[in-house]
């Protein structure tokens, strides 16, 4: 019997050691997860919409398209175009300055969960989630009003905007 108890005690000690090793591994794993989360998290939260380069915007767009297949949400794309007021490209001398102002107004006029990108030398694409078509039109009007106020009265009527609903991936 003494020998049998000795073997049982060895098994118990071995099981405790394995549990301790497992807990230690979990602890390291949790540290790793905290590190990963820290690396992924935005370090300094910039107010307003999230501006991305066009390639990243396309990836986000495709991700949202996939999400739309499962989630009951609405997302819209808003195309904002800077013109000369007659439907043509604005002169280069003013375009860069006006596009910089438009970028700032888009960023501060939207929520932090919305995303936008510069699509061309005189266009921005904006992705707006969890809003109705009417709300997206109101958002576009708010951006235009803020732009005209910031740029001054001589540039009224230079912005065009079009709103398009996003569809779930594979339903085009």
Task: Set out the residue ranges of the language-model regions.
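Catalytic strand-loop-helix junctions within cyclic-nucleotide turnover domains
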Residues: 84-87, 127-136, 153-172
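Conserved catalytic/dimerization core of cyclic nucleotide/dinucleotide signaling enzymes
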Residues: 49-56, 88-99, 116, 135-136
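Amphipathic HAMP/coiled-coil signal-transducing linker helices
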Residues: 15-54
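Catalytic/regulatory signature loops of cyclic-dinucleotide turnover enzymes
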Residues: 4, 38, 147-158
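Conserved helix-loop-beta segment at the catalytic/binding core of cyclic-nucleotide signaling proteins
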Residues: 66-70, 102-133, 152
